[in-house]
Amino acid sequence: MLDRAFEALNPDQGVIYLKQPTGEHHRAAERSVDGLAHEHLESATLLKKVAEEGLTAHVCGLDADPEWKSAESMLDQGVKSLIAVPLTDSQGPLGMIAMTSLSSRSPFGDRELEMLVSVASVASLRIRNLILTEEAVRRSLEVDQIDRELKLARKIQVGLLPSGVPEVEGFELHGCSAPCRHVSGDYYQIVPRRDGKELLVMVADVVGKGLGASLLTASLEALAAGPIEVGRSPVEICDRVGRRLHDRTTTGKFATMFIASLNGGEGKLTFANAGQSPGLLIGANGRAMRLKATGPPLGLFLNTDYSESSRRMALGDLLVVYTDGLTEAADSEDREYGLRRLTLVCKNHRDKPLKEVAQAVERDIGEFARGHPYEDDRTLVLVRRTH
C-alpha cells in the first residue's frame, strides 16, 4: 500500500503508523526517496491531529503555518509540505498514512489528497480484515471454515455501515439495512460535509447476494470514500466510481446507486441516480415525486455520462431512498410489494418520527409477505427537512 501511494504521489518520504492494543502507535512501514538521508518521520503533533483526532492534514508551507509550529521534529528535518489521512472505520481509529515533501513548491494538491484518501480507505478495510481474521482464528479454530468466512464477512460489512446517524442541523435522519442472508450487497452512508452545511446521502445495491456481493460492496465503499471526502458532487462521484468499478471488476459485476447532496440553508436537493430504484420526495402536503434514474448502473459500461437533477426540499418534506429489496419483497403467490404501496405507507406516516416511519414500512412489508422468506437485502434511508 505504501509503495503504491509513494509511486503515485512522488513525495520525499512516506510512513504508515498503526495503533497498537496499548494505544500507542507503531511505525509499520516507511519509505524515502533514494539519496535522502534516512531519518524516521516521527511527529507527536502529526500523530495527535491525524491518528488520534481523525483529522485530515493538508499543509503547504509547514514552517510558516502557526498551527504546526509545535511540529519541531518535522521542521528540523526540513519538511515543507505534507498530506496525512487517518486510517479508520466505524469501529474506531487504526492509525494514519502520511506523505511529506522537502520542496518549497508543494507537489500535493486536491487530486493527491483524494488519491491518498482512497488509499487510506482501502488500507483501513484490509487492516480491519486482518484484525478480524486474527480474532476469528484465535476464537474459532473448531468452527467450520465456511461458517467462519461468513461471520467474518458480516463483521466487515457491519463495520462499513454507519454505527448511527449523525446529527445535522436542519435535518432529521434515519437509516437501516437488513440482509436476507448472513451478509448483504446493500450499502448506505449519511455524511455531513462542508462543516455541517451540507449533507450527503448514498444508498447502493451491488449485483448478487451473499459473500461475493459483500466483497463488492466493500470495494464500492473504498472507491467512493475519496471523492466524498474532498467534496465531489453526486454526478462526479458516479463518474469516478463507475469508471474505477468497471476497471476493477469482471464482466457482469455492477452496482446501482442513489446519491444526493442536501443544502440545509437553501433546502436544495441535488441527486444522481445510477440505475437505482426511484427515490421519493414526499411533500408536507402529501404529494409524492419520484426521483428517477439519471444514468445506468455503475461499472456496467466504461464510458458513461451521468447527469444530476435538483429539487427543493421545503420544510417538512421527506426524502425516501431505498433498495429494491423493499419493493420486490414477495408473498407466497410471488406478487411484489411494489412502489405504490411503499409510497402510500410513507405518505400516511410522513408526520411521524422517522424511526416510526421505518418501522411502519417494515411492518407493512411483513404483513404483505405473510412469512414468505425475503429474497433480497433491504435498505431504507429517510431524511426530513426540519428547519
Predicted regions mapped to residue ranges:
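Amphipathic coiled-coil signal-relay and dimerization helices
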Residues: Y17-L18, G23-R31, L269-N273, M289-A293
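Signal-transmission/dimerization alpha-helices at domain junctions
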Residues: E52-T56, S90-P93, E114-R139, A222-V230, ...
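Amphipathic alpha-helical "output/dimerization" segments
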Residues: E42, L46, D89, P107-R128, ...
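Regulatory sensory and allosteric helical modules in signal-transduction proteins
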Residues: H26, G35-S70, L75
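… and, occasionally, acidic/histidine-rich disordered N-termini of signaling adaptors
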Residues: D12, V137-V320, G371-H387
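Regulatory loop-to-helix N-cap segments in sensory/regulatory domains
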Residues: E39, L94-V119, K209, S307-S310, ...
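Short loop/turn motifs at secondary-structure junctions and domain boundaries
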Residues: D65, S73-V79, P107, T251
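A short, aliphatic-rich beta-strand micro-motif
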Residues: K80-D89, G95
